[in-house]
Amino acid sequence: MSHLDQVIDQEKPDRRIVVAALGVTQILAWGSTFYLLGVLANEIARNTGWSYDWVTSGVSVGLLMAGVVSPRVGRAISKWGGRLTLAVSAVLLAAGLLLLGSCQSIAWYLVAWLLLGAGMGSGLTDAAFSTLGSIYGENARGPITSLTLFAGFASTVCWPLSAYLIEHLGWRGACFIYAAIQIGFALPILLLALPRGPSVPPPTADDEGARSRASLASGELPIFALLAVVLTLSAAIFSMVGIHLLPLLQARGLELSAAVGLGAIVGPSQVGARIVEMLIGRHYHPIWTMISSAVLVAAGTALLFAAFPTYSAAIVLYGAGNGLGSVARGTLALALFGSSRYPVLMGHLALPILMSMALSPFLASIAFQVKGATLTLGLIAFLGATNVLLVGLLWILCRRRPTAAEID
């Protein structure tokens, strides 16, 4: 073992500490950005007189900005590790929340979301996955799967917290408290728990297989492009269902309380599927996790479209598939392209994923308003079925690689 390897091994922290630190900070980051307006939007619109549509567009603005910065974030994590990048994210989120809480016009409100978007792009799921890849290399699959368990509790933790803060401090006070949490709690945790640099040694100049961390061989380009399409389509389905599930169920004749009860099934279904993956996933290639995810999501959305007598079965299937999809999003690229290129490639994959999450709810909203719930659910089911075919093609391409034996 070289001196560099010894230093890296000594500085590599306990996986449980790193995953716990990232898990807690991911809950806070998601809860103070993507899930923030789920509770604050109505209060902001009522208090300011701004259009509700303009208020809720803040998340889309943030996701678009996150997509723009994500490729640079991947390169930064590849070069310097995730500690500095995630710390910068906490500072950006705090600054964005401070501006959000003090803004007096819709223009400054959207500027605040641009700042929050920069923090989202440098600190949410893909950045956290890339950080784990830079620390643990080829052994990052287990930590990535464990981290996804935490993410499923972001709304569970932060929606009640946001509601409590609004009741006692108002929406502006809630933003200020979340800003303080980012600086006073999340930032120190990240600085203390994460190593100073990547634990995966950088490629040397004479390493022909690593001339560039982002380079792809000609045979890898179709696989990477198809993986990007699959993940983007998966993100579109997730965003459409996540935003419109309750209104779609109500349009099908369900009462609000019944729709909310069904929607609550998604979270436990996601976590349950991730626990199963954590227990048995190491025994098979991540492409099978992706296949399982696509099939379950397609089955769930098809049953929703068909008005299956038991909606709960459809939502359990969808939730389980979505939960596995989050794991596959973090582990499949690692398995296909290796750890040295992983942070950079994850940054490039995050760009279309985040753009899709920002724009697809608008498309679903237009379909819902113009053609109604049945056509909208049909569109989502069609996308789910299409993704199964694309994942099947991805499996075929992966099997043709020289290392395809491990996929069987």
Regions found by a protein language model. Name each.
Residues V18-Y52, S70-V73, W159, V241-L246:
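Extracytoplasmic
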Residues V266, Q270, H283-L332:
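C-terminal transmembrane helical hairpin of 12-TM major facilitator-type secondary transporters
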